Amino acid sequence: MKKALLIIAIILGSMTAFAQNLDKTEARLIKAFLAEPAKEGTNAQALKVADINAIANIEGVTVQNGHITAIEWKDKHLGGTLNLAGFKALTKVDVSRNELTAMSVEGCTALVEVNASRNRLTEINLAGCTALQNVQVYKNRLTEIDLANTPMLEKLNVSNNLFVELSVANCFNLKTLNCQGCHLESLNVSGAQALRNLYCGYNKLTSLQLSGVEALQNLNIDDNEITTFIVSGLPSLASLICSDNNMVTLGVRNCNALLDVVCSYNDLTTFTLDDCPNVQYVDCSYNDLTQLVLSNQTFLQRLICNNNQLTMLDVSFDQALTYINCRFNQITDFRTIACDNLRMVACQWNP
């Protein structure tokens, strides 16, 4: 019995020593954060910290070998500035759904994932985070973010912030970018050669250059101010959504993997699909088109082109086509040669 008690005492003593041996700089910065005001009281009170010197015992904090490796403080009503600069063993931070106003993880060379979404951040410092792969900072008040030293970044969600311009140029490993619902007037994705998913709707973009993003699969530029948009030579592009842009001209060519095109609620007078042989769904409703030629689209199944000014519609030899909605047009020339699977044509309110 005495031997067992001795072993327990040794273990407890080791744990106490371990907690006390936390890196001094890390301990100082965490204590400073705990002293900052939260929604009610201090951050220490919000986290129900009984002893600010026992950092290793704080819920959501993981410590290994004298260094903090993870912080998970989601939805804890925390406030103020969180400074984690120089935490060399830190790999993951989740402080989403709080009221933080500023955050720094500068020099956290092991950091892989940051989630600081749904806060009140006006600034964030990611400098020197060379291992960073996933950044989620959506629904904040950021006006800028520097990604120059994040070469491993794969996922970035900065939607619903206050950016006027954003550059992910030369983020060679970036696969998914969500920057919807900001105030973007300029977006630079040049050189983001691994980019597959780009969601940049609900901004103020007047143009978008897609050079060097041949891996792109999904593109959403809904609700911007792009009047002319030419998409060419994107062999992996499967989905294009560009509604609500006041767009006058849309040209899509040499996109062999393209399946869906949604360009409704624009001012299109010109819409062309060239060398896009696998398109299955087109919605170009609520535009100003007078002619629409989509013949020889072998895999096209559904066409929505209502509320235009069409006088001619040609879907000849579209062998997979089953449904057309061409209501509210002026169609007098309707070509459906060899459309053997066409089952429904909604064509009311034409001459």
Show where each model-derived region lies.
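Leucine-rich solenoid repeat scaffolds
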Residues: R327-P351
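Thr-biased low-complexity repeat/linker tracts and other Thr-enriched repetitive architectures
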Residues: A110, T122-E123
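Canonical leucine-rich repeat
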Residues: T81-L82, M103, I124, I145, ...
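Conserved hydrophobic beta-strand positions in leucine-rich repeat
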Residues: T69-I71, V93-V95, V114-A116, Q133-V137, ...
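N-terminal capping/linker segments that flank leucine-rich repeat
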Residues: K3-K92, T109, T130, P151, ...
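Leucine-rich repeat
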Residues: N65, F87-L90, C108-L111, C129-L132, ...
